[in-house]
């Protein structure tokens, strides 16, 4: 519910730029050199959440809950698969901005 309310409060065409990637928060889309990257809803939600909190490390459970809106203890392993897919889809934009923090989770690299 909270995630839905945050989406509703966004202004149209709110944008976020991280490196060479542009996030259209209203359309829930990621662009690289004006080319849309095809992310699933879950991939986009995880990617956006990390990008909005650069440098902050999140556990798989935290990312699952942020992306899907409920406790993800049983399904947190799905985050690993989503991260793998996100990295593959962001590969044309260069080195992955998502860093694995071993034993903890993932974070969006600063810079």
Region annotations inferred by a language model:
Residues 1, 25, 67, 83:
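Short amphipathic alpha-helical/adjacent loop interface patches that line ligand
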Residues 56-67:
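Short coil-to-helix segment of the ABC ATPase nucleotide-binding domain corresponding to the Q-loop/switch region
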Residues 95:
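G2-box/ATP-lid motif of Bergerat-fold
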Residues 17-44, 101, 107-111:
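A structural micro-motif at secondary-structure boundaries
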Residues 52-55, 70:
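Short helix-capping/hinge SLiMs at alpha-helix to coil transitions
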Residues 1-17:
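Basic, amphipathic DNA-recognition helix from helix-turn-helix-like DNA-binding domains
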Residues 2-3, 38-48, 60, 73-92, ...:
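DNA-recognition element of transcription regulators
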